[in-house]
Amino acid sequence: MNIHEYQGKEIMKQYGISVPRSRITFTVEEAVQAAIDLGCEVIAVKAQIHAGGRGKAGGVKITRSLEETKSAAEAILDKILITKQTGPEGKVVNQVLIEEGLKIEKECYLSCAVDSTTSTVVLIGSPEGGMDIEEVAEKTPHKIFKESIDPAIGLQQYQARRLAFNMGINEACLQEAAQCIMNIYRLFMEKDCSMVEINPLITTEEHKVVALDCKVCFDDNSLCRHPEILKYRDLTEEDPREVQASKYDLSYISLSGNIGCMVNGAGLAMATMDMIDHFGGAPANFLDVGGGATAEKVKEAFKILISDKKVAGIFVNIFGGIMKCDVIATGILQAVNALDLDVPLVVRLEGTNVELGKEILKSSWLDVITVNSMAEGAEKIVALVNGKGVVRDERLN
């Protein structure tokens, strides 16, 4: 689960991490009043959306007067902000953070995440803050420093000090920076985060260490242990189809293609999308119904698929292990019948009760095409979508 920058900073304050004074606002009038109340010479007006790259897209503006603050808020609020992470459709900015400006001495980068290679938590630091860490890693990899953490003993003080030193923190701020790193790790572990990032982590002319910008993400599977985190969820920042899918324990991610995919298992889903791409098609989504899907779940999955107006065809690719193919077949027929499906549907079933499942589909009067392999199914749905009218007419005749 993603949260906004200002929410991440609220949590960081609970862990003793210094952040600038700020206030979240929803109107231009509120933004101006917040600037007055902060009483700072320099004010940052920052768009709050669930995406990075806001600064380069014009979503962060530095102002030095109330008139400039007002103009900046007017330019950002209720506008669509397009960054490299939002996609071409962008995101509407519903709120802006009004934040005090600080006198920056140095900018650094700091993050905490799980290293998929070693399956351990790793802290990443760099003296190059305020820019894309991917760009730093590509052009100057020697400026990226890592501290892998032994899960048996946790982060040690000497590791935090070493990372702070490698990040170029001056001696006057070294101890405070090391403590900040320790606090970030504690936040990461106690809140079951998937990532905590501060970019930039700054030192000020007053020798303070401050998180100027941050990103905090949580493991969805851990939210049952953290009801206090759920209050931060902003459904307006999420795809409505993804929200609906989560209600039925379905994993859904919207993509840019026009072929809807319904699969069980993340690995099979990835293979299915690759196969569709191989035959010249483009998947419209990643939809994993999981290992224990019921007929009701399948019906809801179809509702989500056809709610995407880009979908011109659907490929169902199911391997029945715990899940029985006859149950899936029944769910498919119920969904097609109830939803009046008007796009081509190709189904490949394999596994438990597969013959019974195929028989259920073939004996129905509904327009469902069954295939025997993933490759055959992918090729068929791509052909149907690319030559939709001709192919379907030939079949129906």
UniProtKB/Swiss-Prot annotation:
<feature type="binding site">
    <location>
        <position position="99"/>
    </location>
    <ligand>
        <name>ATP</name>
    </ligand>
</feature>
<feature type="binding site">
    <location>
        <begin position="321"/>
        <end position="323"/>
    </location>
    <ligand>
        <name>substrate</name>
    </ligand>
</feature>
<keyword id="KW-0816">Tricarboxylic acid cycle</keyword>
<dbReference type="GO" id="GO:0006104">
    <property type="term" value="P:succinyl-CoA metabolic process"/>
</dbReference>
<dbReference type="GO" id="GO:0004775">
    <property type="term" value="F:succinate-CoA ligase (ADP-forming) activity"/>
</dbReference>
<feature type="binding site">
    <location>
        <position position="213"/>
    </location>
    <ligand>
        <name>Mg(2+)</name>
    </ligand>
</feature>
<keyword id="KW-0067">ATP-binding</keyword>
<keyword id="KW-0460">Magnesium</keyword>
<feature type="binding site">
    <location>
        <begin position="53"/>
        <end position="55"/>
    </location>
    <ligand>
        <name>ATP</name>
    </ligand>
</feature>
<comment type="pathway">
    <text>Carbohydrate metabolism; tricarboxylic acid cycle; succinate from succinyl-CoA (ligase route): step 1/1.</text>
</comment>
<feature type="domain" description="ATP-grasp">
    <location>
        <begin position="9"/>
        <end position="244"/>
    </location>
</feature>
<keyword id="KW-0436">Ligase</keyword>
<dbReference type="GO" id="GO:0005829">
    <property type="term" value="C:cytosol"/>
</dbReference>
<keyword id="KW-0479">Metal-binding</keyword>
<comment type="subunit">
    <text>Heterotetramer of two alpha and two beta subunits.</text>
</comment>
<dbReference type="GO" id="GO:0042709">
    <property type="term" value="C:succinate-CoA ligase complex"/>
</dbReference>
<feature type="binding site">
    <location>
        <position position="264"/>
    </location>
    <ligand>
        <name>substrate</name>
    </ligand>
</feature>
<dbReference type="GO" id="GO:0005524">
    <property type="term" value="F:ATP binding"/>
</dbReference>
<dbReference type="Pfam" id="PF08442">
    <property type="entry name" value="ATP-grasp_2"/>
</dbReference>
<comment type="function">
    <text>Succinyl-CoA synthetase functions in the citric acid cycle (TCA), coupling the hydrolysis of succinyl-CoA to the synthesis of either ATP or GTP and thus represents the only step of substrate-level phosphorylation in the TCA. The beta subunit provides nucleotide specificity of the enzyme and binds the substrate succinate, while the binding sites for coenzyme A and phosphate are found in the alpha subunit.</text>
</comment>
<dbReference type="GO" id="GO:0006099">
    <property type="term" value="P:tricarboxylic acid cycle"/>
</dbReference>
<dbReference type="Pfam" id="PF00549">
    <property type="entry name" value="Ligase_CoA"/>
</dbReference>
<dbReference type="InterPro" id="IPR013650">
    <property type="entry name" value="ATP-grasp_succ-CoA_synth-type"/>
</dbReference>
<dbReference type="InterPro" id="IPR017866">
    <property type="entry name" value="Succ-CoA_synthase_bsu_CS"/>
</dbReference>
<keyword id="KW-0547">Nucleotide-binding</keyword>
<dbReference type="GO" id="GO:0004776">
    <property type="term" value="F:succinate-CoA ligase (GDP-forming) activity"/>
</dbReference>
<dbReference type="InterPro" id="IPR005811">
    <property type="entry name" value="SUCC_ACL_C"/>
</dbReference>
<comment type="similarity">
    <text>Belongs to the succinate/malate CoA ligase beta subunit family.</text>
</comment>
<feature type="binding site">
    <location>
        <position position="46"/>
    </location>
    <ligand>
        <name>ATP</name>
    </ligand>
</feature>
<dbReference type="InterPro" id="IPR011761">
    <property type="entry name" value="ATP-grasp"/>
</dbReference>
<feature type="binding site">
    <location>
        <position position="107"/>
    </location>
    <ligand>
        <name>ATP</name>
    </ligand>
</feature>
<dbReference type="InterPro" id="IPR013815">
    <property type="entry name" value="ATP_grasp_subdomain_1"/>
</dbReference>
<dbReference type="InterPro" id="IPR016102">
    <property type="entry name" value="Succinyl-CoA_synth-like"/>
</dbReference>
<feature type="binding site">
    <location>
        <position position="102"/>
    </location>
    <ligand>
        <name>ATP</name>
    </ligand>
</feature>
<dbReference type="InterPro" id="IPR005809">
    <property type="entry name" value="Succ_CoA_ligase-like_bsu"/>
</dbReference>
<feature type="binding site">
    <location>
        <position position="199"/>
    </location>
    <ligand>
        <name>Mg(2+)</name>
    </ligand>
</feature>
<protein>
    <recommendedName>
        <fullName>Succinate--CoA ligase [ADP-forming] subunit beta</fullName>
        <ecNumber>6.2.1.5</ecNumber>
    </recommendedName>
</protein>
<dbReference type="GO" id="GO:0000287">
    <property type="term" value="F:magnesium ion binding"/>
</dbReference>
